[in-house]
From Swiss-Prot:
Localization: Cell membrane
Source superkingdom: Bacteria
Identification of the protein by name: Uncharacterized membrane protein YufK
Predominant localisation class: membrane
Organism: Bacillus subtilis (strain 168)
Gene Ontology cellular component annotations, sorted alphabetically: plasma membrane
InterPro entries to which the protein is assigned, alphabetical: DUF5366
Keyword Transmembrane part of the UniProt annotation: yes
Amino acid sequence: MKNTYLTGYFPLIAILLFSSSLSISTSLYALKMLSSFGMYDGMLDYFSEKGIRLALFAAFALLYFMVLSALKLIANTVTELSLLFFANDPEGNNLKKLRMGSMIYLGGGILSFVLLQNVIWIVIWFAVVTLAYFVFTVYRIYSTLSLMSLVGFILLELLFWFTFVIGILFIFIKLYNSIMASLPV
């Protein structure tokens, strides 16, 4: 690619695509839940149907955009920290090699609209796209790293994300248990 800045907007567009598909799917599910609880008809007395749909979409889109943006920031930081520790690349050539990987997320974001009927399928698709990006990352930089540096890079990335996911799950379990313990039984 001639201009290295051409792909600079791909991560933002991919985040917008994934957050839009997730928020559409979540909005449809929330509308079903509101209808099953009998709240939707009461809401129609005060708001139009389009207004309710738009408000739900905007709220979920903002939530998913913030989460995906934070994950992108964390992922970039961990990748650059891993490269700092294990790559002998003071000019940053490895980072330039990884720029085209944003096309993987862009394509995944476009294809996520096929899976709008179920949030779980979109999350699974996001995990598959993330795994494909990780394989792309390792493939692009393996020639510049020694075997031990490559193993260290992979282990640091995997260990961080494993610890991060386990930590988030632990926090949600603790929160759930504290809410359940505070309920009068």
